Amino acid sequence: MGKKTQKKNSKGRLDKYYYLAKEKGYRARSSFKIIQINEKYGHFLEKSKVVIDLCAAPGSWCQVASNLCPVNSLIIGVDIVPMKTMPNVITFQSDITTEDCRSKLRGYMKTWKADTVLHDGAPNVGLSWAQDAFTQSHLTLQALKLAVENLVVGGTFVTKIFRSKDYNKLIWVFQQLFEKVEATKPPASRNVSAEIFVVCKNFKAPKKLDPRLLDPKEVFEELPDGPQNMEAKVFNPEKKVRKRGGYEEGDYLLYHETGLMDFMKSEDPITMLGEYNKFIVDEEDHDWKIVKKLKQTTKEFLACIEDLKVLGRKDFKMILKWRKAARELLGLDEEEEKPEIEETPLTEEEQIEKELNTLQEKQRLSVKREKRKKNEMKQKEIVRMQLNMINPVDIGIEAAELGRESIFNLKTAEKTGILDKLAKGKRRMIFDQNELAIDNDIHIDENAPLDDRDELAEADELESQLDAMYSNYKERKSERDAKFRAKQARESSEADNWNGFEDKQSDEENEEETKDYVDDDDNSDLSDSDDDEAINQLIAKLKSRENSSKLSSKARALFSDSLFEGVEPDLPGKADLADSESVGDVKQLTKKRKLNPLPAEQISEAESSDEDSDFEIVANNEDGDVDSEYDSEEEAKRTKQEKHSKDIDIATVEAMTLAHQLALGHKTKHDLIEEGFNRYSFRDMENLPEWFVEEEKQHSKINKPITKEAAMAIKDKLKALNARPIKKVAEAKARKKHRAVARLEKLKKKAGLINDDSDKSEKDKAEEIAKLMRKVTKKAKQKPKVTVVVASGKNRGLSGRPKGVKGKYKMVDGVLKNEQRALKRIAKKHHKK
């Protein structure tokens, strides 16, 4: 018998893709490469109506394109070798580097442009790797040239290249012409192969193209190597760099020596430290005899220069310091004295002209800088508005810029500390020279550079921008965060503290002063926008003084009680001891009334006992019964307190600790008041940005200590809350309970009817009622338990009921039984969770 012939397996080409290509009817295994690339990069072939395949032989990529592209698509394949015809594919023989191929493509394409250009060509390899790789890169560049001429805007170019030194140059060229360039290696490509595929998407289609970009001589030009980086070798000696480019021609030695004095006199010491292995000392050298006496010339130094390749950074620095000291000793680093150039003094006109030119140049640079900043701000705002990030705020910022160069600025007055004087006086609108010199914003030095003034304006502008950005940030956060909205609502609803009784007389005087001040200001010639702002701020400040002398909302609610209707608003400035005692009695009386309301007789007696005091408590001008009104109001207040006491909940460990301390008597009310006075109580937040104040609130509070018992109490409370059933379970239980109650009510009605029936005896009534009770209390029918019997051993092939099995049964094999047990175990596990 003859030997069975077997096809040669060249480098593993007869793999699974070879047999898959045979089964699918493709001409080569490379068809799966383009299939995998197409799937990875968004199925670009399915969207392409015109496809060009360069170096297409034997035509496997054209077959894939004809299968994946839409119907009636134009597919053109070209190669230097002839190909068999394929359905729905135009093929012709030509060299892609010639003009003949370019003209034939134009003839087939007419006015169309290609959506995708494919290139899977490779030269005949076998000479030398450097030559083969360069030929492949040259072929890829020619394919790119054809693609640039025929691709549509946004088209795709897929090409094969070899990994070589020209790879980065080609990638750079691709990146100039396409928006997205990625290198990939599909699974169908063998690992031993040096080929990789580059996918270039979104062709830019430039109107003007530099011809050097597609010229092989320009693209693959050999550039001279730059100077070798010896600093990395000296200052990072631990990092070894391989000589991937080989060694210099003619230099076949790895060991080099030179003289120490040559190193000292060299202008490039770093390079010599990186190149040489040893520095030789010539004892007869005159310079060495001089520098030998240096204190840096130690035994350690002489040992280091014996072998430079084993030194570290510290040793190299020591050698460089020795070289510097030696050069200073020998006078090699002395600079030559430059001849002094006599400066001719400028005349007065020339000096004025020079200063004028300097000022004009500074002014031009300042205007240019401001213009650039405004353009940058507008660009940022346009981008933000396009992304729907914020509302346009340019109008407000530009409006704020209008009054910046005004004569009078109230912000400046506030910085100088004269705002209080302005508020007190009526016609003071001009600052003194001494006061003007306090702040740099008002006192402008004529000799000061323009940059200082610009910096102040920039600071004000930046502050206004930050405030606007912070307000926009709060608006955006409140839109998307419900907790932040609730926090803002709580902060806005907080009531002000009581600051005392209002003084009507002082308020009227302040109003008159404000009115006179405003009238005088209206008659003045200052009608700028800053003056209006100043007036508004002054009026606001005066009104704030009025508000500070008035009652807060809580105080008004307290003193609106009928008990205080007769109290005179004007209190004496200095009260005697009897007055204070009477006030104390009133407080004690009201406290007792809150705790235990007194009868009307006792209240009248208490009031009559206080007639001798100077302080009039209540003036009963009305004929109504005060006691009944007081009792009703006390009851309403008590019910309101009881209602709100239910809402009080101790939810934090700190609150629980404080509650424990108050309950056990470790702390009193006085202690809590004392704790309220701390370093954060009177922190000055005036004239600070809002965003800074909000951020400081998180840190401007005392961390109060907590106890283990309080933490355990909160933990138990949370555990009890978490132990409650979910809403769905609670609703189901409630429905079940409701149905049970309804059935019980129905049973009661039926039992009542049976009991009212006089025709029946007591025994019959009892039996019927017991029958009804049994119907209500009967348990649900339980499903009969099914016994599982394994069909193995004596039960294998058994027909009929197995021995010893009662009730329902089920014959199963071992696998099914294990599966059933596993399902039960999983269901039980989930039920526990």
UniProtKB/Swiss-Prot annotation:
InterPro entries: RNA_methyltr_RlmE, RNA_MeTrfase_FtsJ_dom, rRNA-MeTfrase_E, rRNA_MeTfrase_SPB1-like_C, rRNA_MeTfrase_Spb1_DUF3381, SAM-dependent_MTases_sf, SPB1-like. Residues 505-532, 622-634 have a biased composition (Acidic residues). Its main location: nucleus. S-adenosyl-L-methionine binds at G59, W61, D79, D95, D120. GO terms for biological process: maturation of 5.8S rRNA from tricistronic rRNA transcript (SSU-rRNA, 5.8S rRNA, LSU-rRNA); maturation of LSU-rRNA from tricistronic rRNA transcript (SSU-rRNA, 5.8S rRNA, LSU-rRNA). It is found in: Nucleus, Nucleolus. One of its GO terms (cellular component) is nucleolus. Keywords: Coiled coil, Methyltransferase, Nucleus, Ribosome biogenesis, rRNA processing, S-adenosyl-L-methionine, Transferase. The active site is at K160 (proton acceptor). It comes from the Eukaryota. Residues 477-532, 592-645, 776-810 are annotated as: Disordered. One of its GO terms (molecular function) is rRNA (guanosine-2'-O-)-methyltransferase activity. It catalyses: a ribonucleotide in rRNA + S-adenosyl-L-methionine = a 2'-O-methylribonucleotide in rRNA + S-adenosyl-L-homocysteine + H(+). It holds the Pfam family FtsJ. Residues 348-389, 453-481, 730-782 form a coiled coil. Residues 477-493, 635-645 have a biased composition (Basic and acidic residues). Its EC number is 2.1.1.-. Component of the nucleolar and nucleoplasmic pre-60S ribosomal particle. Belongs to the class I-like SAM-binding methyltransferase superfamily. RNA methyltransferase RlmE family. SPB1 subfamily. Required for proper assembly of pre-ribosomal particles during the biogenesis of the 60S ribosomal subunit. This is AdoMet-dependent rRNA methyltransferase SPB1. It comes from Kluyveromyces lactis (strain ATCC 8585 / CBS 2359 / DSM 70799 / NBRC 1267 / NRRL Y-1140 / WM37).
